Amino acid sequence: MGKIKALLDTNIVIDFLNQREPFYEQARLLMIAGRVGEFDLWISSSQVTDLIYILSEGGKPSLIPETRERIQGLRTFVSVFAVSEREIDKMLASSWKDPEDRLLFEVALSIQADCIITRNKADFESDLVRALDCDEFFTWLRTDSTSTTTQ
């Protein structure tokens, strides 16, 4: 059995980096546990540019250096999957309402993620990859993750 792989939705990363309440504490606990190696945390390459844009308030030049530093800090314990033509083509051929969510779903399939951690679970309804919020993820870890992980 391999280590659990969790793909982070952008909203979870923003909750952590911006200390956004009331979600920050759970996102912080998630990041701490990932940092000490309890499981592997992932984001996609497309999320990196989204995060830079959002965290720098639309790309304000004065905020870019600090934003880069924050994401570099995140990179010390979060892996990045390089989105390829495969994921892009699957997203473009999909009928999902939100292309960004579909792309993240395709990344989850490509890295064989055990779950997507998000606050918007309805955006990821699928039997192929479970979508969990932070609380559900920790509950799942304690209860049945050892019997259902991939690899």
What are these regions (language model features)?
Residues T76-K121, T148-T150:
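Active-site neighborhoods of divalent-metal-dependent phosphate/nucleic-acid chemistry enzymes
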Residues M1-I43, G59-L63, S126, F138-Q151:
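Short, well-structured N-terminal submotif of metal-dependent ribonuclease cores
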Residues R28-M31, R35, D40, S46-W96, ...:
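Active-site-proximal, substrate-binding regions of enzyme catalytic domains
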Residues K121-V129:
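Short loop/helix-cap segments at secondary-structure boundaries that form the rim of catalytic
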Residues V48-T49, S110, F138:
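Alpha-helix N-cap/helix-start and coil->helix boundary motif
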Residues L128-E136:
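Active-site regions of enzymes building and remodeling cell-envelope glycoconjugates
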